[in-house]
Regions:
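Bacterial N-terminal signal peptides that target proteins for export
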Residues: 1-11
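N-terminal signal peptide c-region/cleavage motif recognized by signal peptidases
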Residues: 20-22
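A short, N-terminal "cap"/entry segment at the start of jelly-roll beta-barrel domains
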Residues: 24-64, 150-152
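Double-stranded beta-helix
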Residues: 31-33, 105, 125-152
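Conserved short histidine dyad/triad with adjacent acidic residue
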Residues: 64-81, 110, 119-120
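Glycine- and acidic-residue-biased ligand/ion/polar-headgroup-sensing regions
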Residues: 71-74, 80-101
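Short beta-strand His + acidic residue motifs that chelate non-heme Fe in jelly-roll/DSBH
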Residues: 76-78, 96-97, 118, 123-129
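Short acidic-glycine-tyrosine-enriched beta hairpin
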Residues: 100-121
Length: 152
């Protein structure tokens, strides 16, 4: 199975998982959208990473889908979100851990096609250790990010 097939399958599984749990059934309905990779409009976010909104709006009630492109060696300190999310690794390898402190021993390497969950209010952290990584996030807003202070 090709990497593209794995990523497509993983994205479908993530969407079906959210739908089955009722997460996509609440809030404003999605508008019809058909977007090719060339049509994505990437915007530099506050952390220097690039983001593109595919559907919905994370700041509003209802389903949303966006992608983030992490630069090589980007580390995101522990943080959490008020909503639950399912994340698919579209390209690259992302190292993901759960907990309130950034702990390299808790990281798991997730290559393209992998999926991880971000339960509501569950602290987690990521590292694009080996190079650029693109993820796709599916959630049910409204959403936000709360950073966790790190012990020295």
């Amino acid at each position: 199975m090709s990497k593209l097939s794995i990523v497509r399958f993983a994205t479908c599984v993530a969407a079906l998982t959210l739908y089955a749990t009722g997460a996509l059934a609440q809030g404003e309905p999605l508008k019809p959208a058909r977007v090719t990779p060339d049509e994505l409009k990437w915007i530099v976010g506050p952390t220097g990473n690039q983001n593109t909104l595919i559907a919905g709006d994370p700041k509003q009630a209802g389903a949303y889908v966006y992608r983030t492109r992490f630069a090589a060696n980007f580390r995101n300190r522990p943080h959490f979100h008020p909503d639950q999310r399912v994340v698919t690794i579209m390209s690259g390898t992302l190292y993901v851990g759960y907990g309130e402190q950034f702990d390299e021993s808790q990281l798991k390497a997730l290559p393209a096609g992998s999926i991880f969950t971000e339960p509501a209010r569950q602290p987690h952290f990521v590292w694009a250790k080996d190079g650029e990584v693109v993820i796709q996030v599916i959630g049910n807003g409204p959403s936000a990010t709360t950073l966790i202070e790190q012990k020295p």
